[in-house]
């Protein structure tokens, strides 16, 4: 049976963050953006322990058989949450939503990786979908903009779902095997609320990965290209003797008891 794989877009394939910073500089001025960046760097030094404690709490909730605490979902990337006030965020998003076909202006985070994904999916008969919670902007719908962007980057006929709910429930409803995301809370949703396995694309320092991540069976890779290497190995003919999730566990260095039943 072919792999059924879902890819998040922003932070995994598309560089939304850089474009939002650019738009923030247009809106507020570069000096203010630089001050906010300095403030964010100071906060980073004091929030690492808090993040780890939150990860431990999430682990305990799952171990006790309780669902993980719900997180507030919005459309603001984590980096800008640290840098901007709520009022500034709202003003930025109002500005972005007025830009015609904004989602087609983004750069590819890793040039060529989308075309590589398309080639691998075609050769290996993977069923690939793309998940996003992008808000609407002027111009075409967020779905159509995203489809055109993916096609321009080398992925023909992309299946794009603009969704707001739990990634885990979506994975369960679509009977997905693997979900790739750059948000730890989305990966947690996947492993708690579905039978799918989650791979976290974590571009920051490894020491800042939430403590609960690996204990809950979430694989961690540094880049999307690394993720494609792992998927290739999972799907390789030399690994067919073992089960899919055993292959995921082995290739991502997870302990056997770390994968939820």
Per-region residue spans from a language model:
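C-terminal accessory extensions appended to soluble enzyme cores
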Residues: 236-261
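Short, acidic loop-to-helix structural element flanking the phosphoryl-transfer center
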Residues: 90-91, 97-130, 138-144
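Acidic, Mg2+-coordinating phosphoryl-transfer loop and its flanking beta/alpha structural elements
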Residues: 179-219
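Substrate-recognition "cap/lid" segment bordering the active-site pocket of phosphatases
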Residues: 135-178, 184-189
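Active-site neighborhood of HAD-like aspartate-dependent phosphohydrolases
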Residues: 1-91
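Short acidic-hydrophobic, aromatic-tinged amphipathic segments that line or gate anion-handling sites
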Residues: 160-163, 217-226
